[in-house]
């Protein structure tokens, strides 16, 4: 590629503002342009980089048995209605009707469609296991696009899906994907942490995220440096203290005027927060199959010294989205904001943390202005509809595995894998005949990587004050050839010859043949960030050597013209070998072995 004819120009400064310096560099390097909120166009350099990333994905997925397919972005809504996600997913799922009035969706993920295909293509256990994958543009109407490619509305996604006869087969596939993901990210040059995560709207029994640690990330992780435990905050468990076990005492009402917070309550009564119960009032909107929207009121209770985890609450009540109840809604169930508890309320789903359920004689709201109750006990004073872990893990909490302190870190999720089990196959009737002739639901897994988000994280990781420093495996070109004279000169003739010989040797070259000052060309080479730069000018002709510069290290060397091609081929091979050396098997966490 010659820069004199390249579509798209480098920029001295990035248009607009972004909290991601990597995103600013992608714009300055003529990789992409923003065309709308959360919507981007890739220019030739950026799209070539995306294709390099996709090549890594294809190679590793095919290595573990994946077969590439292409599924439609437009899905019949009926498939999504059969699984229920049409009704539980909010406005981020784009819904529309065709001219015949049929409901359709723009699929932001393809569990329904691939299950439909599995139902039609897999008949017997002899056809299992199978795995398919695709690389496709998707749309999710995200309400808060941010940080360039990190949070967008339209995006390129690699999604893969596996079919197995049973949970043991799925566990084997899950382990293979876990290892393949680590290989993919290392081959691309991105350090990631694999952490337990919430299954979210995907459903299933187990999920892991692959997270790039960065201060600009939206995800909060809980990490134990002692034993290696790591989880997204939405799914993180921790070692909870032992509950109080004193015998039930008599329920007693006590005046607490103005004590509408746990802090005020503990100060007024002189009790520790650990002996109080905190009420959280939430609401979930549920759309029925007739598209009637009903609102479910939820009252969650955690210990006063802890915080509620809305994701865990939503999982227990099977609600995709929760919102705070209004004061009017709180009154409707017989509660009082600031003095609320499940005691005496009606028309509400009560969700209680396991530690509260096991504790005795807590202080809780009396559902009367200025009043609380002493000695509240679950089972006697109110009944829980759901009991489980609904508290949020925090820095300093005890690791559930080893008891050491947890710490927090921020990061960006670049990939996620799920054990779906039979959720979708059961809903859509995707079955196979086993060896005994019995019909059984297919056991499924799904595995996704955000390709654009991966590029964004690579730009964040591989940069300096001058520009990008892209790994050789994903850089749009391997060599930046810079001519510091006009094309008709002796230096120009040498540069053209080197350009042709490099391409003939299989080296991908971006040739800066523009009529520009040397400073402009060097600045552009730095911001684009190809692994190696070759400079040829009048001094090169006089010395009989070209300057070769490593972008990552900044080290330069004079290489005779008759050795330039061989030297660059050698250096590219060495850069690839350095990356390959990072691809080593790792010990997998115990949870991925469980069927």
Curated annotation (Swiss-Prot):
Cytoplasm among keywords: yes
Signal peptide feature range: none
UniProt keyword terms in alphabetical order: Aminoacyl-tRNA synthetase, ATP-binding, Cytoplasm, Ligase, Nucleotide-binding, Protein biosynthesis
Keyword ATP-binding: yes
A GO CC term assigned to this protein in UniProt: cytosol
Main location: cytoplasm
Residues in coiled coil: none
Reaction(s) the record says it catalyses: tRNA(Pro) + L-proline + ATP = L-prolyl-tRNA(Pro) + AMP + diphosphate
One term of GO molecular function: proline-tRNA ligase activity
Ranges where the record places region Disordered: 1-22
Compartments it resides in: Cytoplasm
E.C. numbers: 6.1.1.15
Any GO BP: prolyl-tRNA aminoacylation
Function: Catalyzes the attachment of proline to tRNA(Pro) in a two-step reaction: proline is first activated by ATP to form Pro-AMP and then transferred to the acceptor end of tRNA(Pro). As ProRS can inadvertently accommodate and process non-cognate amino acids such as alanine and cysteine, to avoid such errors it has two additional distinct editing activities against alanine. One activity is designated as 'pretransfer' editing and involves the tRNA(Pro)-independent hydrolysis of activated Ala-AMP.
Cross-referenced HAMAP family: Pro_tRNA_synth_type1 (MF_01569)
Family, per entry: Belongs to the class-II aminoacyl-tRNA synthetase family. ProS type 1 subfamily.
PANTHER family: MITOCHONDRIAL RIBOSOME PROTEIN L39/PROLYL-TRNA LIGASE FAMILY MEMBER, PROLINE--TRNA LIGASE
Domain notes: Consists of three domains: the N-terminal catalytic domain, the editing domain and the C-terminal anticodon-binding domain.
Record note on quaternary structure: Homodimer.
NCBIfam families: PRK09194.1, proS_fam_II
Record-given protein name: Proline--tRNA ligase
Species this chain originates from: Salinispora tropica (strain ATCC BAA-916 / DSM 44818 / JCM 13857 / NBRC 105044 / CNB-440)
Classification of source organism: Bacteria, Bacillati, Actinomycetota, Actinomycetes, Micromonosporales
